[in-house]
């Protein structure tokens, strides 16, 4: 007898081996029809998978995240099937699941056009409606290589040939199409009902620029039509909010070919930057951090000691002077260790919190650059905490509370926390890792935070906490990190004198809340669609006169506001007031003040809030109080 334990704890017994589909059928016809895959002892498998031992089983349907991934993976194969039907000379390569969809790379004699995509999507719909069975076959490697070579599929044959000879090869067949895949896949193409092809782009074979250029078709697939419609609406909204467009429209920044991945900040954009930096500087000072500054360029020998030269050199900008090799720093941590090492440290000095708004440079591939979101030159709200093992929990707890408070001030209320745990290849003993991981858990628990654990996702030198913020249109962005480092203090010989006069290595916590300033400002712009809250807006107030006779009064109002610390300017141009109001409204200025003879004579201003909200006429002092409250409350 084989005993199958279901997620609710109930058990079902079968006289012999049984498939996932048969178990689902035994539970009910509805579940059998809905089944897309199974999870046997935590492993995702096809519904045709035979269970020949006692096991735990969950039936995967389109209500599960795993089910949606199976749909997307299967739709990638459906895409390849359709392409081969329409363009038999095209060669298939790889087709993985990505966030919200999938892609498939093809080698073809010409680029696919938008008309091609429409035809391919139509063919996919036809093939799905045929409801052909998707069948898994097991082949040995050499036979599988021969099969794909006979079909003229040189890329697929190359992939299979790189697999060890003793490893079984899984092939999936649907109709006349066969493809290499680990699976699992839906039981039949009829399960694939909601999908859309999005775009085509170029991609190098195996990601190597020295190889052939392929055609990458991107698509999205969902369990329900309303989910896809919501996603497509989100994409439309994201297009409207694109920070690159906003940067141009609002005159905040630009990028140009002579400095790829580097940002030219215009006066208004730099005002926003400064507002964010000064805010963060204040928060760090209040939290007991000391701000430092470390060199941009340091000798190769330091990067060799830290391990960056051996493991990260391809991402570093290097230079040579007077027969010495240097690197422009890609990160601040080695420099901070040098400050820690300058002079003898005592346990009484710990925790030592060193912060730096450090400019870093990384040689990112040109094809990966994307506005402010992916750059080569960037500044981080970087800091490193040097502490004892006993101080890990308290320091992690304090950082977690600070991070959540900062995100709240910037308007991000929905924050998800993920804890990345030890990988198979790692430095340090299991005992040290146990202590480090449990310390981070205790800190999160003490803050009342829920978190998701990611086994095997930690860096080789320590576990990590990630902070993911959700924006106004539902996108998630990973910004903050708290990385425990068990290796760098050893590499760079950092030590302190302990209470018993012995020398010990400090624990090093790498931490950032915003991450890259450039990227965070891009996220802020898109979150607010450019309409930044008053405390961050580059221009908080514009004062406009109706006629020349009010120009002097308008100037005096601006001077008063500037003395109060507000970012205010006057628009005294000889233009119609409606024109000026419209122009500054498009620039998303939080407050527009209009002054005519009546307002001048009464020392008042007519106030319009962003969104064409008429707040009426009020004394200048009343408006000042209103703006002060907005800034103080981060409204």
Curated annotation (Swiss-Prot):
Reaction it catalyzes: tRNA(Thr) + L-threonine + ATP = L-threonyl-tRNA(Thr) + AMP + diphosphate + H(+)
Chain spans, region Catalytic: 242-533
PANTHER family attached to this UniProt entry: THREONINE--TRNA LIGASE, CHLOROPLASTIC_MITOCHONDRIAL 2, THREONINE-TRNA LIGASE
Subunit structure, interactors included: Homodimer.
Function: Catalyzes the attachment of threonine to tRNA(Thr) in a two-step reaction: L-threonine is first activated by ATP to form Thr-AMP and then transferred to the acceptor end of tRNA(Thr). Also edits incorrectly charged L-seryl-tRNA(Thr).
Family: Belongs to the class-II aminoacyl-tRNA synthetase family.
UniProt name for this protein: Threonine--tRNA ligase
Taxonomic lineage of the native organism: Bacteria, Pseudomonadati, Pseudomonadota, Betaproteobacteria, Burkholderiales
